Amino acid sequence: MEIPRQEIHIEIDNSIPSSKEFKTGLADAKPVVLMSALRSLHAGYFRISLSLCSQALLWKIMIAPESPSMSHMHSKLPSMAFHLLWYLALVTQVSLCFLYALKCIFFFDKVKEEFLHYIGVNYLYAPSISWLLMLQSAPMMEPNSVLYQTLFWIFAVPVLTLDIKLYGQWFTTEKRFLSMLANPASQVSVIANLVAARGAAEMGWNECALCMFSLGMVHYLVIFVTLYQRLPGGNNFPAKLRPIFFLFVAAPAMASLAWNSICGTFDAVAKMLFFLSLFIFMSLVCRPNLFKKSMKRFNVAWWAYSFPLTFLALDSVQYAQEVKDPVGSGLMLIFSSISVLIFLGMMVLTAANSNRLLRHDPVLGSATDPKDKQKTLSLNATNQN
């Protein structure tokens, strides 16, 4: 007896869906990624271009043939490296300015929040500082040229505008008193005025330079004393931003450079400011535990190590040119080497952690005022009662 066989036919459809039916979403994801990057971008990223521009200025001074204190090792530094560094700084600065301009167009509310933030508002000076340093280190322009002077005013006017707004708030606005908002980042405004003072002195505008220098130094003394007293505003400074403590080094170092350009010589005042920055640097270096929490994960705030040390290196070069002794040459060699090594290390770390660059910054996403959280809690408690 034969059992009837049943045949089973299996058909496999290998057809590929059309492009209309199958979408990867990559084309739609690109604008989303760009918008997310713009939303996360803030003025603190100009620390990168600020470091590049200050490093270019250091190299320009070190390879200058008229520098009498430069040893034969420094005199052989290739000028091509300086030109490459300057153009890299230019590309970085233009790129950051372009991206930040896009943020102002598409996310103006975020820019406004940054302006109201007690830390973020200080870094609105950073683009102007970078441009002024780039102008002073430019290899193709002389300070007496019309183009140089025009660009100087274009970059210096935003500094004066922010001075009037920010310093005016410290004096007159009850909720924006310096005693409540003071933090190490407040020294960025001081550095901006001092960099502008040096630029004016290089052009021979001594009256303008003295005006900017006096404005910067008066507010530096006020900020320094306020921070030294450890008032409530300083206690709200996030641990991840502690590299910004090196701005304590940058401010007197830049003041020394500006005064040297105004007077034409590295006199006693310039030396006093240099020694102050040197003392503060040693004080910070002797306290590595202060920066332990901030070094756990890469953050763009790490660039705050670079440009203050470059300012100190620039100061040491000017000091060595004045004293012409082994101690001055040794300080110049030490701080120039440290500055270059820190700068190169930051370049490598930034390239290795490029995927972390444009992430949401929880610091700027916090309250715009250090007292806002306490006020919010008290209001909630009142409403519950």
Swiss-Prot record:
Q: Which family does it belong to?
A: Belongs to the SLAC1 S-type anion channel family.
Q: What is the lineage of its organism?
A: Eukaryota, Viridiplantae, Streptophyta, Embryophyta, Tracheophyta
Which sequence ranges are listed under topological domain Extracellular? Answer: 66-81, 136-150, 198-207, 265, 321-330
Q: Name one Pfam family in it.
A: SLAC1
* Protein purpose: Slow, weak voltage-dependent S-type anion efflux channel involved in maintenance of anion homeostasis.
Main location class: membrane
Organism this protein belongs to: Arabidopsis thaliana (Mouse-ear cress)
Q: In its UniProt entry, what is this protein called?
A: S-type anion channel SLAH1
Which residues point to the Cytoplasmic side? 1-42, 103-114, 172-176, 229-243, 287-299, 352-385
Quick one: where's region Disordered? 366-385
Q: GO:BP terms for this protein? A: chloride transport; intracellular monoatomic ion homeostasis; positive regulation of anion channel activity; response to salt stress; response to water deprivation
Recorded GO molecular functions are:
voltage-gated monoatomic anion channel activity
**Subunit (UniProt):** Homotrimer.
